C-alpha cells in the first residue's frame, strides 16, 4: 500500500457517509448510551498512541495533544498521505507485537471500523435518566 492508499483507508473508516465513525455518530440522538462516550474516548486515545509510535520511527510530527476525536480523525488522514513511502516498512512494537508502519495503520483502520459498528448499534438506544 502507498501513503495515499492508507490515507484513503483511514478516511473511509473515519468519514465515509454510510459506514464510519462519523456516520455512526450522526445516528446518535438525545441522551447517548454511556458506552458511546467510552468508545469515542478509547478511539481518541488509541489513535493518538498509534500515531505517536509512527512519529517516533518516521520523524513526522506527533498528533496534536489537544485534538479530540473529530480533529484527530482529520489529522491522521493528512498525516498518512504525507508519510514518505520508504517509512511504511519501518518497524514498530505495539503491545509486544512487531508491526510495520503500514500494518499498524491498517490495524488502526480495522479498529476504527470495529468500534464504529459498536457505536452504530448503540446509537438507537435512548437513555432516560
Whereabouts are the PLM-identified features?
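Aromatic-glycine hotspot motif
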Residues: 1-129
